[in-house]
């Protein structure tokens, strides 16, 4: 499982295993331009909604919102120089273009005052240094993807087992942060990360408060990884008194070389965000199963439920559920082709159909991505 390898290798992308050797290794020679790496990814897809919505829109989806239309999801170019030796400076910049960029663009950068994102984005841009304290204290400053959640925004170094994204990914947690984060490997089993940022998906802060994120990562074995996240801070415009808080739990367990399990749970609330000025709450859980069938073939299943008690996250008070079946084939070492058979269910009639709104939404999708 791609996500499992990322988590188990470092208990989230910010907790690099290179930190464990940072103190013992001598400083790396400054190789200048030769040390800079270039990577990339191209993802394209097609989705068909069996409800036949007149607007040709898949309701409540994160990225796969276009019905009956071929789409360029994202083109990504990453330029980076990893830092691993004490006091060695590094950086990473992710340039993206496509439909994904329009959704995840941060306010204050490629999202205008009306809230409309553009088809280009500076997905990540940060500088890094490893301070020679203990096993190595890693410091990152700039813009980076969130450390919350089981699923990721697809990139050259990580993508999900399912082609579509969960409700938890889209509505329970943020996409990116801009600020400062420090991470430290206490032992091969326990890692920590602390971040202070402007907020959720903001390059320019919308109030005078800051958002704080604490992460604990546990890797009891090479096959099991558990991440606990807590994030809190004011996120409303010109309001630093009312906080948004989320507790996020992620676990992956590789039972065998062919069978992997995953879990994600989120519990969130926000003061003064419910109708009437009360506290809004949302929660959900998702389960994942991936089975390597044979050779380049694999099959993944995701099932989840998400309760938006007050409608603060989806716009209407409802409980959403979905199940997704994803067959996959790898064409060589750089190309992945995935199908996506998905059924969304709500306790409210929120899904557009040919003659009105329904409580279910079945879709069929295909996705191809190439990375280097």
What are these regions (language model features)?
Residues 14-21:
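C-terminal segment of classical bacterial N-terminal signal peptides
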Residues 30-58, 70, 91, 224, ...:
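Transmembrane beta-strand segments of Gram-negative outer membrane beta-barrel proteins
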Residues 33, 82-86, 132-135, 146, ...:
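Outer-membrane beta-barrel channels and translocator barrels
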Residues 40, 44, 72, 76-81, ...:
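Residues on the lipid-exposed face of transmembrane beta-strands in outer-membrane beta-barrel proteins
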Residues 43-47, 94-98, 144-146, 195-200, ...:
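Outer-membrane beta-barrel pore domains and translocons
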Residues 48-70, 100-217, 227-234:
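Surface-exposed coil loops of outer-membrane beta-barrel proteins
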Residues 61-64, 101-104, 110-116, 224-372:
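Outer-membrane beta-barrel pore domains
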Residues 63-100:
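Glycine- and aromatic-enriched membrane insertion/assembly motifs of diderm outer-membrane
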């Amino acid at each position: 499982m791609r996500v499992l390898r990322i988590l188990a290798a470092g208990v989230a992308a910010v907790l690099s295993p290179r930190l464990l050797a940072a103190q013992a290794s001598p400083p790396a020679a400054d190789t200048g331009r030769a040390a800079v790496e270039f990577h990339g990814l191209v993802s394209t897809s097609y989705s068909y909604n069996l409800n036949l919505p007149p607007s040709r829109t898949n309701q409540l989806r994160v990225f796969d919102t276009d019905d009956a239309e071929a789409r360029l999801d994202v083109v990504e170019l990453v330029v980076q120089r990893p830092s691993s030796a004490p006091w060695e400076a590094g950086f990473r910049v992710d340039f993206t273009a496509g439909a994904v960029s329009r959704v995840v663009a941060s306010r204050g950068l490629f999202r205008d005052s009306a809230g409309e994102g553009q088809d280009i984005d500076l997905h990540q841009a940060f500088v890094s240094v490893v301070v020679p304290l203990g096993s190595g204290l890693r410091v990152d400053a700039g813009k980076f993807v969130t450390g919350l959640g089981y699923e990721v925004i697809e990139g050259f170094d990580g993508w999900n087992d399912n082609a579509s994204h969960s409700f938890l990914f889209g509505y329970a947690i943020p996409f990116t942060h801009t600020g400062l984060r420090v991470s430290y490997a206490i032992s091969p089993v326990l890692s920590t990360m602390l971040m202070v940022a402007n907020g959720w998906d903001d390059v320019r802060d919308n109030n005078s408060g800051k958002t704080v994120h604490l992460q604990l990562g546990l890797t009891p074995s090479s096959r099991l990884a558990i991440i606990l996240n807590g994030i809190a801070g004011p996120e409303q415009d010109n309001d630093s008194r009312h906080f948004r808080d989320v507790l996020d739990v992620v676990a992956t367990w590789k039972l065998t070389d062919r069978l992997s399990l995953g879990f994600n749970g989120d519990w969130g609330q926000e003061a003064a965000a419910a109708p009437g000025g009360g506290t809004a709450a949302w929660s959900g859980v998702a389960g994942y199963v991936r089975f390597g069938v044979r050779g380049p073939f694999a099959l993944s299943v995701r099932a989840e439920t998400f309760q938006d008690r007050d409608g603060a996250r989806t716009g209407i008070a409802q409980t959403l559920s979905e199940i997704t079946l994803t067959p996959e084939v790898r064409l060589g070492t750089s190309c992945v082709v995935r199908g996506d058979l998905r059924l969304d269910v709500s306790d409210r009639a929120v899904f557009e159909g040919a003659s009105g709104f329904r409580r279910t939404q079945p879709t069929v999708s295909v996705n191809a991505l190439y990375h280097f």
